[in-house]
Structures are given as structure tokens and as C-alpha cells.
């Protein structure tokens, strides 16, 4: 699933609930300092990804337009969090787009194998 991905890759992480422990037999494919399970394989054709690489230039602002989401980020990261988060996403946008395309191609390949 992550064939062709760099060893370390950025993602947008904005979730209140996350998988922290995998069931027996599942394989942890990616982790980060903030989330011990970023991607996992649960069965030969069942995967999960928690970090977002499928973002577009407006994604952070769109999510921030939802009051509960904005409040959550502000309470965790402080004033100006949206601007910092949006700027960080913008810096990585080209890589996000390349990784999203790679992930799509990988999903198509493993779905038919």
C-alpha cells in the first residue's frame, strides 16, 4: 500500500478519535509521534489510514469552518493554530498531491492482485 512512499512523510492529522491499538493479526504500516497507528493492514485487502494526504489547498480552511473542529484545534494548539496549520499544509501541498496519486495507484494495484 505504501510502496514508493518515503520513509518519513507528512500528513494532515486532525481527528478527535483514533486507533491506538491494533487487533491481533493487524500490521502497523506507519506511525508518528502523535499517533502510534497512522496506517495499518487488517487483512490481505483491508487497510486503514488515519493521517490525511488527500488534502487540497482549501482543506484546512474548510475544516476550520466547522465550529466544533475549529474549537478543538484552538483548544489544543492555541490562538493562531488555523493559520499555522494552513501554512504547514501549504508548504507540503505538492508532496501531498504526489503521495495521494501514489496511494491511489497502489490501492488499484493491490485491489486486483
Where are these regions (language model features)?
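Acyltransferase
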Residues: 58-113
